Amino acid sequence: MGKLVVQGGAVLEGEVEISGSKNAALPIMAAAILCDEEVILKNVPRLQDVFVMIDILRSIGFRVEFEENELKIKRENDISQEVPYELVRKMRASFNVLGPIAVRTGRAKVALPGGCSIGVRPVDFHLEGLKKMGFSIKVEHGFVEACFERRIDYVTITLPFPSVGATEHLMTTAALLKGARVVIENAAMEPEIVDLQNFINRMGGHIEGAGTSRIVIEGVEKMQGVEYSIIPDRIEAGTYLVAIAASRGKGLVKNVNPDHLTNFFEKLEETGAKLKVLGNEVEIEMRERPKAVDVTTNPYPGFPTDLQPQMMAYLSTASGVSVITENVFKTRFLHVDELKRMGADIEVSGNVAIVKGVEKLSGAPVEGTDLRATAALLIAGIIADGVTEISNVEHIFRGYEDVIDKFSELGAKIEYVEKEN
């Protein structure tokens, strides 16, 4: 495990190409379990989480080839009903193979998930939904076992909260429940869910409504092989846009779907940044101190929780006081203490952070606590005076492809240093 050494004071200029969406690729890879024929996925980012999912697919009987950004998946052996704990503990999204394995083989046993430490993200919504679809659920010794027990004709599942993971898990599983009609109410509406619907439908599934709060799945008997391209990563795009603005630079962010970031764009413009949308590219310029703004995270189409830490780093040097309210992951403020070590003036009360803008941050040793928090500290290091050393930095490689090269090409001075034994 190494650290990132960031020399502050760089002004980011130039172009950056956005990779495929990790949060779309992972559930689509899990959905490939539904199909015996070869699935070819394009625009797949080369990230640690993707490699973990590849290992999971291989462990349960699939052949997986990954060259550049193209992934080929095909069932090679009988599907194993159990996923090793050492794989599932590495990544929360790996839990979403439980339903697809169970619907294919009648039974699945998967360890309770791991992943980023940003508060409780219970799997109860997943399990209650699977029960309604005819699966028995047993939780013991850190594992969840799902067994298919009864066929259903029709069921409505109302999620207590529009959970992205639960929505993806349940719609994927329901897609292969032949003859069943499953309705998910209060479904998450993220673009990644629309991408998953489009992928499953290309394989022969019958799903409607993704992108709205009501998704209807008509289960089919069999899926077919398909070639499919993953959507661009809206969170990666937002991270580079806010980094360029924070450095008071100018840049062009390419391979973006602007419709996926409308709320975020509005907030950037409120701070004084100038944005110009050019098809699937976004130009941003910011030459002055940002104005303070209030930010409230909400499920899509609200302001993305995955961009809240980066926005906080940006607003830490704004003129005035910003109020950031976190409504998705209530404890997603682990980065606050690290930003304060760099001179930020931030106070937290419950799920609200009060950010009083300071003139400058100063470089300091800090620690990455999760994926997006580490991205926020990288942005803070770029705009700070002096040198910032970010330890526990491996988080960032879970969500940003070629992150050091991309930031360096924009003019950031970043070096990855291996930790000495």
UniProtKB/Swiss-Prot annotation:
It is an enzyme of class 2 (transferase). It comes from the Bacteria. It comes from Thermotoga maritima (strain ATCC 43589 / DSM 3109 / JCM 10099 / NBRC 100826 / MSB8). The gene is murA. UDP-N-acetyl-alpha-D-glucosamine binds at residues 92, 306, 328. NCBIfam families: murA (TIGR01072), PRK09369.1 (NF006873). Pathway: Cell wall biogenesis; peptidoglycan biosynthesis. The keyword DNA repair does not apply. Keywords: Cell cycle, Cell division, Cell shape, Cell wall biogenesis/degradation, Cytoplasm, Peptidoglycan synthesis, Pyruvate, Transferase. InterPro entries: Enolpyruvate_Tfrase_dom, Enolpyruvate_Tfrase_sf, MurA_subfamily, RNA3'P_cycl/enolpyr_Trfase_a/b, UDP_GlcNAc_COvinyl_MurA. This is UDP-N-acetylglucosamine 1-carboxyvinyltransferase.
